[in-house]
Amino acid sequence: MLPEMLRNHKGTIVAVLIALALGVGWASREYAHAEEKAKFVQAQTLNLADIKMKEIVYEGRPRGEVGIYVEGETAGTRNFVVGQARLKPGEEPHPIHTHPEEEVLIVTAGKGEISCDGKKTNIGPGSVMYTGPNAPHGIKNTGNDVLTFYFVKWIGVATRK
């Protein structure tokens, strides 16, 4: 009886099997897409209280502290980093340096000096620095109070290898 029933509903059975195959295929594609998406920085809002600040130590001496808000890849970048740094008076996080990322610094408190591509500029709240890939740059606190700034670094999709 069962084989005859199967023969009578062959079209329905084929349709159900196709639907199951499509469903499994769709589910596996969605799973793969979710795994790929998880590698990228997700939309989010963070408060300073959510960020763990770490001490900046260079040549064995504490220079200030840094906290990273976001780090990872986005749809248009790789090595994307957003953070905040606080430098003690007279300190710099490290000497003038270069890196492959573009970078923006936004000063929110204190006084200092930025060296960008060979030019030194006095800075304070509201000062902004942009530097392209591999351009020499650095920042130093020249004031009597903590120098606070935010930074954003990234490598654009066009420069991906």
Task: Put a short name on every predicted segment.
Residues 77, 133-158:
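Ligand-binding loop in jelly-roll beta-barrel domains
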Residues 15-23:
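Bacterial N-terminal signal peptides
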Residues 66-71, 83-99:
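Conserved short histidine dyad/triad with adjacent acidic residue
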Residues 24-79, 160-161:
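A short, N-terminal "cap"/entry segment at the start of jelly-roll beta-barrel domains
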Residues 100-112, 117:
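Glycine- and acidic-residue-biased ligand/ion/polar-headgroup-sensing regions
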Residues 1-8:
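N-terminal secretory signal peptides that target proteins for export/translocation
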